[in-house]
Amino acid sequence: VENAQATDGRRFWWWLGGALLVLVVVLVSAWTWVTVRGDGRAGHVVTGSADDLREATFVLLDGADVVRLRTDDLGGDAYRVSTSRDSGVRPAVSLADGNILTSLRGTGQDGPAIVEVVLHHSVRWHLRLGGGAKEQHLDLRGAQLGDVEFTAGASRIELTLPPAEGTQRTVLSGGANQVVVRLAGDAPVRVRAGGGAGSVTVDGSTQSGVAGGTVLTPPEWESATDRYDIDATSGVSSLTVDRTDGDG
């Protein structure tokens, strides 16, 4: 009798362990489908739940032909990254220490690598774009924004920033041909041309042949509570900083 009871006990635990294993496999498979594979019928789409997320860093690890990034109300999602069905790349996302790491994987298709990124407007975002691109267009006028950094080269960068809260810092450490930064409101802006520039235009005033290490600082910048700080640590051909009305 005791042997029979022991055998039944072992069978129960084997059955329970097997059931738990199946459950884990199902959950992992579901997570992989939603956050990595996406819905191929509408292109390659990756989303992730916002839950109680208040602040995060979005990192793009790989290069693309074109990167377009903006903020919007995504409901229950914190982010959405997508490429077209025929794109040569598809996004894959992993999470590490509060960083949303986005890589681009080959699809075998010959379509352009155009990456669309939408981030939830209620989350405070820090952005780090690597890998380089022909064009990068970031419309952040409605964002809650921390630092923005471009760590790889680009042919053209267009960056629209929200009104400054504290010191809004943008770093261009990868070099670029043309950079256009649009600021909302009248907060003062400091521009560093650490790597030199063919030309720098700030609020309509242009300097040509700008030497590396040049810093353009208006008198009111040091004492301002809300201000912009643009640091081009690598060389650029043309850097233009102008203003928007802040309303889009």
Regions flagged by a language model, labelled:
Residues 1-14, 23:
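Terminal targeting segments of Actinobacterial cell-envelope proteins
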Residues 14-16, 32-34, 126, 222:
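Short linear interaction motif-like sites in intrinsically disordered regions of transcription factors
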Residues 33-103, 114-122, 126-128, 135-142, ...:
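Short linear S-[DN]-x-LW-Φ motif typified by the pepsin-like aspartic protease active-site region
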Residues 9-11, 27-29, 121, 217:
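Acidic, low-complexity intrinsically disordered regions
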